[in-house]
A protein has these predicted regions:
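Beta-rich, blade/repeat-based domains predominating
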Residues: 1-7, 42-73, 103-126, 135-136, ...
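Short loop/turn segments immediately following the C-termini of beta-strands
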Residues: 14-15, 79-80, 122, 133, ...
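WD40 beta-propeller blade core
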Residues: 21, 84-86, 96, 139, ...
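Short loop/turn segments that connect beta-strands within beta-propeller blades
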Residues: 24-26, 89-93, 142-146, 180-184, ...
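Surface-exposed loop and turn segments in beta-propeller and other repeat-based domains
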Residues: 28-61, 93-112, 186-214
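Loop/turn-rich, solvent-exposed surfaces of beta-rich toroidal or solenoidal domains
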Residues: 124-131, 151-195, 199-201
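Blade-level signature of beta-propeller repeat domains, shared across WD40, Kelch, NHL, RCC1
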Residues: 215-248
């Protein structure tokens, strides 16, 4: 994010690191933060590092992604941990949170692995959009965390990016989806989802000889650049980055 003419990196780390940090563009640490114990719900000692164990669960802190609030603060998705969205001020001080683990009824405002998050400014007012991955949907919230709407029918949406009136959604099961400002699907890029769904043992992810140029295997993230090109990062055996060049 550019702040006062200077670029900064915001990074998350889960597993044994269980923290998030703000870095300069050259990699120097501005600050590093740990589990927001004031939010409640976390196991005792979850904010204490280093650690050698690696327990998982809804009482753990395993952050996955950021979204930047228009006021200079940010939202943080605890995507592998408590399944909540935390809000912080510009200095990394915890303010509030919303969301909870969902049950089989998949009620609005509850999550099952909220891996990705971004600010959707395609409408009249900016909204928080959450990639509710294991529930196969996107959910929209006000900047205060009030549930607004959702879109079902995705596979395993991992994150979201926005450019002009388009939303970009990497779907882990072999495709990247584009939505318009009305949240309607306008296209699936590199769609190989049928082959990925049939690969129950995930052999394709491990065997590069089975990858097909122009088709995606396991897109874990995607973003637009300043010219509207798309970059897709895939979680495969040795990793793969694909650039899709904007044509019009």
């Amino acid at each position: 994010r550019n702040e006062g003419g200077e670029d900064f990196l915001y990074v998350t780390a889960y597993q044994r690191q269980r923290s998030f940090a703000k870095l300069t563009a050259t990699g120097e640490t501005v600050w590093r933060k740990y589990a927001p114990m004031e939010a409640g719900g976390y196991a005792d000692g979850e904010d204490v590092l280093p650690r050698q164990d690696n327990p998982w669960g809804r009482d753990r802190f395993m952050p996955t992604n950021f979204a930047f609030h228009p006021d200079g603060g940010f939202f943080l998705a605890d995507g592998y941990g408590s399944y909540r969205i935390h809000r912080y001020d510009a200095d990394g001080n915890w303010l509030s949170c919303f969301g909870s683990p969902s049950g089989p009824e998949k009620s609005g405002g509850a999550f099952n692995l909220p891996h990705g998050i971004w600010i959707d400014d395609t409408g009249d007012a900016p909204k928080v959009v959450v990639a509710d991955r294991a529930n196969g949907r996107l959910q929209w919230f006000s900047l205060d965390g009030e549930y607004l709407s959702e879109l079902d029918g995705l596979l395993l949406p991992a994150n979201v990016d926005v450019r002009d009136d388009l939303l970009l959604v990497p779907d882990l099961v072999g495709r990247v989806t584009l939505l318009n400002a009305a949240h309607e699907v306008v296209g699936h890029l590199g769609d190989d989802s049928a082959r990925m769904n049939a690969d129950g043992k995930k052999a394709i992810r491990r065997d590069e000889s089975l990858w097909i140029n122009g088709k995606f295997v396991h897109p874990h993230d995607a973003c637009f650049d300043g010219e509207g090109n798309i970059y897709v990062a895939e979680w495969v055996q040795r990793g793969r980055i694909t650039k899709l060049r904007r044509l019009t």
